[in-house]
A protein has these predicted regions:
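Serine/threonine-rich low-complexity intrinsically disordered regions
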Residues: 42, 50, 56, 78-79, ...
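Extracellular ligand-binding/catalytic regions of CAZymes and related secreted enzymes
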Residues: 2-22, 29, 68-244
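Low-complexity, Ser/Thr/Pro-rich intrinsically disordered linker/stalk segments at domain junctions
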Residues: 246-250
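Short, solvent-exposed loop/linker segments at the N-terminal edge
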Residues: 251-258
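Acidic, low-complexity intrinsically disordered regions
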Residues: 60, 65-67
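E1/E1-like adenylate-forming module used to activate ubiquitin-like modifiers
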Residues: 3-54, 59
Length: 258
């Protein structure tokens, strides 16, 4: 979301690339970073004082930040996604017509993304889930103003021209489905939690086996296998479908019958 740059260390040794710098110029509404040809506002900021021009994050990740904190939402997977390879050997794969799976509350949080067709959307990107939530703090501009709105989250996947398989969880808290031990385990924002209690603990509802298995499936399709396998998970094999789809345009005769 925020573009950053490196500077040497400030300890007197001057080691390269030791200090991470951002001026969050988007908030200022102008160029304030003293390095003239480098922008350290939001990647998406398209205003003329950005010397590098807009480079929205979804051009790489497939999704773009729109929902600000604090959110603690479940992930919803309707039956239309049940046949996707991503969900093989999960409860989602067994969904019937009209059914949907509602996965662990907190998977979507504390901030999350959408898939927007903003001119930078990667070609061939497709969805693996669909969750719509009302009354979220929704971005209104280049990264400074938020107001109540409705947003729809999707897990996404696409094949980059380099051959890389790019998965977009579009959420900070995907790890909540993998391991029950994490921060704000009850989903209560730290500023509202009991200051005398620990900030890191065991989520009483986590983890989520569906998320664990789907992640295992994803890694298998990327050519990565676990050294040891959790007992309740199913080994996953990589896809053998390596040919890209093709399309062709044919000119038909005027009297052709289809």
């Amino acid at each position: 979301f925020w573009k950053t740059r490196w500077e040497p260390s400030i300890d007197g040794w001057g080691d390269r690339h030791r200090t991470l710098v951002t001026y969050k110029e988007t908030h200022d509404g102008g160029k304030i970073d003293p390095v003239d040809n480098v922008w350290t506002g939001t990647w998406r900021d398209a205003r003329p004082f950005n010397p590098e021009g807009p480079q929205p994050e979804n051009a790489l990740t497939g999704t773009i930040f729109t929902v600000n904190g604090w959110r603690n939402d479940p992930l919803v997977v309707p039956d239309e996604y049940a046949a996707m390879r991503f969900w093989r050997n999960t409860e989602i794969a067994d969904l019937g017509p009209g059914e949907r799976a509602v996965l662990l509350k907190g998977i979507l949080g504390h901030e999350w993304d959408e898939d927007l067709d903003n001119g930078f959307r990667p070609p061939g990107l497709f969805h693996l889930s669909e969750t719509t939530v009302d009354n979220v703090p929704y971005i209104q501009d280049h990264g400074s103003v938020y107001d109540s709105g409705t947003a729809t989250h999707h897990l996404t996947l696409y094949r980059h021209e380099s051959g890389a398989l790019v998965f977009g969880a579009g959420t900070i808290q995907w790890g909540w489905g993998l391991d029950a031990h994490h921060d704000t385990e009850t989903g209560v924002p730290p500023e509202r939690a009991n200051s005398s209690s620990t900030r890191v603990g065991i989520d009483p509802d986590g983890p989520d086996r569906n998320i664990q298995q789907a992640t295992l499936n994803l890694f298998a399709d990327m050519g990565v296998q676990p050294a040891t396998l959790q007992q309740d998970l199913v080994p996953a094999s990589p896809s053998t479908d390596t040919e890209s789809p093709t399309s062709a345009i044919h000119v038909l005769d005027a009297d052709a019958v289809l």
